Amino acid sequence: MKLNMTQLDMVRRQIDRVKAFEGGLYHKKYADITSADIQTAEDFLSLPFTEKDELRAVYPLGIQAVPDRDIVRIHSSSGTTGTPIIIPYTQKDVDDWATMFARCYAMAGITPEDRIHITPGYGLWTAGIGFQLGCEKLGAMAVPMGPGNTDKQLKMMMDLKSTVLCATSSYALLLAEEIAKRGIGDQIHLKKGVIGSERWGDKMRARIAAELGVELYDIYGLTEIYGPGVGINCQKEEPMHYWDDFVYIEIIDPVTGQPVPDGEIGEIVITTLQKEGAPLIRYRTHDLSRIVPEPCSCGSAFPRIDRIIGRSDDMIKVKGVNIYPGQVEDVLKNVAGVSSEYQVMIDHLNGRDIMTLFFEVEPEADRELVEIAVGAIFKAKVGLTIV
């Protein structure tokens, strides 16, 4: 999906701003680039990618693009895989984030009448505060629980009659199991769940929806790009609408870096169009998805990407075939009798790649028949024989 002229103008303004801020990441990175160089969508593709390692290299505040007096808060990545990335926000950034998140809630059919139970963490992490910002912008009641303390979570959920649950998929499943175990389902008033942060398969999705009795929505975002709230699926279809007046999304081949045709799976690359505190241009997220070119039956004109199927850095190559975790899940979800738990093991023996797939079979299923079915579908869909 090419940049339109409005987005192109916004990109040029971003280039002027980031180049003008001495000491910032792009002041040096774009030393030989000017906004006048970017006259077309094709010119935009000549801009270099921005990589996560570049953001880590300028820790703590090297990606800041405005004076300190304009910064009202910071958030940070966890730093579990390396140096944390600190993201500065201006007041406009915070307000824009709230606007995007409120759109997400509205897209899911959530209204000011709802009571929104927020379980993701607060503090430096963007999740909890992002869910709350959008809730307050929408005008709904925020119940800012944060993570943990299941007894307190369930008590507040019952006493306040919360109608929307915001959570990671694993925590939503834990709460669903606890509600079933305690036999308190008739005291729970949840109608919708907004789930983010973790990739989850269809079997897990169906289990949470059934046990909680809710409609589920996938919300997308990442710390470097505001946080959660960049996009969400609507009430009609599974792909996620994203807010292309705030972010431009392109999909590239993760190996060559070249754009792929709309509809093909590749790596998401994001350019922020209005961000002030820490704008990013052509930022490689390593998340895998595709542009969904067909118009949505909900009538929204906002463009769409498909659910995240994995990460380009999770890719493994077996016998010359690129395999992503999402492809394994796609196979398993189509075989009756297979649970949502699986493990893939890759061995290299005598010059040959051997892929072993371990998965759980539901108690009532015929294990031998299930194994045959999984092998056949994997061969047909992925092109590999598994053992």
Q: PLM features: what roles do these ranges have?
A:
Residues 106-140:
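Conserved AMP-binding loop of ANL adenylate-forming enzymes
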Residues 1-76, 82-99, 103-107, 188, ...:
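Nucleotide 5′-phosphate-binding alpha/beta core
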Residues 94, 121-123, 170-171:
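Short glycine-enriched loops at secondary-structure junctions
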